[in-house]
Amino acid sequence: MDKQALFDQIKGGLIVSCQALEHEPLYTKEGGVMPLMAKAAAQSGAVGIRANTVRDITQIKEAVDLPVIGIIKKDYEGTPMYITVTMKEVDELVACGVDILAVQGTSALRPDGSTAAQFIEAIKAKYPEQLVMADCATIEEGIACANAGADFVGTTMRGYTPETQGCDDIDFDFIHELSEKCPAKIIAE
């Protein structure tokens, strides 16, 4: 799907997160649950799916004809980063055909010492046609990631970083300001 067609398809719609970590009730070793959730979301009018792990993304893409935002969640020692942190994970997501590749776009450094903006630049250099989403917590992070090449900026990390602790409610003023100042398309959570 071309970039503009994808933008048009998801604009103003609901993207449903279909993911379960190993310690959560909907996780199964063999998979199969997340594609069922994605089917239910598609039947209910979702315009896209957000999914974690190559296995679940691959199964979801076989089950529904919706754009998939793909991530790999993994904890790394010495950094609070956990959403698609390394180029190895990027390579795996690109190989499984994610429509939008999401990375953590917060101000913390990655294990290799790079910033979110530097990581996005490296992704775009390696995969210039791959759509990239930066999961951010602040307006400054969103702008920096967009300027580095992120096609989308998500409010995913708002309330989950030291700078934004306590921002648990839906913050329409934040979303509005981000959409006014950030050159990328905004995906609000």
Predicted segments, located by residue:
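Conserved N-terminal beta1-alpha1 strand-loop-helix module at the mouth
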Residues: M1-A95, K126-V132, E140-N147
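Alpha-helix N-cap and loop-to-helix initiation/capping positions
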Residues: K29-V33, M81-K88, P111-T115, G166-F174
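Glycine-rich beta-strand-to-loop/alpha-helix junction loops that act as flexible
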Residues: I187-E189
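Short secondary-structure boundary segments
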Residues: T53, I72, G105, C136, ...
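Short loop-to-alpha-helix "cap/lid" segments that border enzyme active sites
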Residues: A116-A125, A137-I139, D151-T155, Q165-A184
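Receiver (REC) domain switch/active-site residues of two-component response regulators
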Residues: V47, D65, D99, D151, ...
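Hydrophobic, well-structured mid-protein blocks that either form specific transmembrane helices
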Residues: L93-A137
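Glycine/Thr-rich beta-alpha phosphate-binding loop at enzyme active sites
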Residues: D99-D112, A146-F174
